[in-house]
């Protein structure tokens, strides 16, 4: 699917929802956004905020032959370019920024989604068999199964046999959920309903892994399960969300090739509102073809 097709899908879905087509959003200060570049410099300041736009736009090459080329290169990518060297070693500011980004990525893996936040969104919260974050990181197999209490809650509080069941899970990035939720879930649910689909009760799974959607789909009898889950963070990019969609999942028979994945959903990648429109179109095609993953035809 090329960019033109994606834009057409977004326009079609947003028009059916009675909303204006979203305009390009100014990039956030995340690493995925294109920075406004500072001029090449020969000095370093340890007082500079390493998370600021100025620090991310810093050019550390001393006495460049073509400063304009470095500025354009730095503006065109979020990669670690134009950082310069001090002999064979990285410059102090470049190393500090690397360490700061690495710390930020570790923090978002270890953080918890606040229970107050889940309640504020009006979401039912259930858990996998995991009881804490340390166990979540060391026992991924337990994150693929719902706890007995969660199974009872789904059976008693959720709509059974929906066309589409939407699930939100923290995964490996708390920031991905809290930063993108408002811009992806409301338009996604509205788009699915506008398409005439029977949408199940959305809920939040704490400590969930991707494969947990198979058990959810089997319990609720959902035709399509859509899981919005936090991606493993990269250096400086902790807000990236993924969508894993699967048709008629079964714990015993569904394999990874049966899933369709849309990744890199954040303001510096695929905008959440645009992703919502693409997911609506994907769900419709899954129901039409009765397939997902590699079994779908283009």
Swiss-Prot record:
Coiled coil: none
GO biological process, one term: ethanolamine catabolic process
EC identifiers of the protein: 4.3.1.7
Residues bound to adenosylcob(III)alamin: 210, 231, 261
Associated pathway: Amine and polyamine degradation; ethanolamine degradation
GO CC term (a single one): ethanolamine degradation polyhedral organelle
Domain of life: Bacteria
Alphabetized UniProt keyword annotations: Bacterial microcompartment, Cobalamin, Cobalt, Lyase
Cell compartments where the protein resides: Bacterial microcompartment
GO MF annotations, alphabetized: cobalamin binding; ethanolamine ammonia-lyase activity
Presence of the UniProt keyword Lyase in the record: yes
Cofactor(s) the protein needs: adenosylcob(III)alamin
InterPro entries: EutC, EutC_C
Gene3D superfamilies recorded: 6.10.140.690, 6.10.250.2060, Ethanolamine ammonia-lyase light chain (EutC)
Cofactor: record remark: Binds between the large and small subunits.
Entry keyword Lyase: yes
Catalyzed reaction equations: ethanolamine = acetaldehyde + NH4(+)
Top enzyme class: lyase
Function: Catalyzes the deamination of various vicinal amino-alcohols to oxo compounds. Allows this organism to utilize ethanolamine as the sole source of nitrogen and carbon in the presence of external vitamin B12.
Family, similarity comment: Belongs to the EutC family.
Entries under PANTHER family matching the protein: ETHANOLAMINE AMMONIA-LYASE LIGHT CHAIN (PTHR39330), ETHANOLAMINE AMMONIA-LYASE SMALL SUBUNIT (PTHR39330:SF1)
Assembly notes: The basic unit is a heterodimer which dimerizes to form tetramers. The heterotetramers trimerize; 6 large subunits form a core ring with 6 small subunits projecting outwards.
The protein's name in its UniProt record: Ethanolamine ammonia-lyase small subunit
Provenance organism: Salmonella paratyphi B (strain ATCC BAA-1250 / SPB7)
């Amino acid at each position: 699917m090329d960019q033109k097709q994606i834009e057409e899908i977004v326009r079609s879905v947003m028009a059916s929802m009675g909303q204006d087509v979203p305009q390009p959003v100014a990039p956030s200060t995340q690493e995925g956004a294109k920075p406004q570049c500072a001029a090449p410099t020969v000095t370093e300041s340890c007082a500079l905020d390493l998370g600021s736009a100025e620090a991310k736009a810093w050019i550390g090459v001393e006495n460049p032959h073509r400063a304009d080329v470095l500025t354009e290169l730095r503006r065109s990518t979020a990669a670690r370019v134009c950082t310069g060297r001090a002999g064979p070693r990285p410059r102090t500011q470049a190393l500090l920024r690397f360490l700061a980004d690495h710390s930020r990525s570790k923090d978002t893996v270890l953080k918890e989604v606040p229970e107050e936040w889940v309640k504020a969104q009006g979401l039912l919260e259930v858990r996998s068999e995991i009881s804490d974050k340390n166990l979540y990181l060391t026992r991924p197999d337990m994150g693929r199964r719902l706890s007995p209490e969660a199974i009872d809650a789904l059976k008693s509080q959720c709509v059974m046999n929906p066309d589409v069941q939407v699930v939100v899970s923290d995964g490996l990035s708390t920031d991905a959920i809290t930063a993108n939720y408002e811009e992806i879930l409301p338009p996604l649910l509205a788009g699915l309903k506008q398409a005439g689909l029977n949408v199940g009760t959305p809920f939040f799974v704490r400590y969930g892994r991707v494969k947990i959607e198979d058990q959810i789909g089997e319990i609720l009898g959902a035709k399509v399960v859509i899981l919005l889950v936090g991606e493993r963070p990269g250096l400086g990019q902790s807000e990236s969300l993924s969508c894993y969609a699967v048709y008629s999942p079964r714990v015993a028979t569904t394999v990874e090739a049966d899933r369709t994945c849309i990744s890199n959903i954040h303001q510096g990648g695929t905008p959440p509102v645009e992703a919502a429109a693409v997911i609506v179109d994907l769900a419709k095609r899954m129901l039409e073809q009765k397939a997902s993953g590699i079994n779908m035809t283009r």
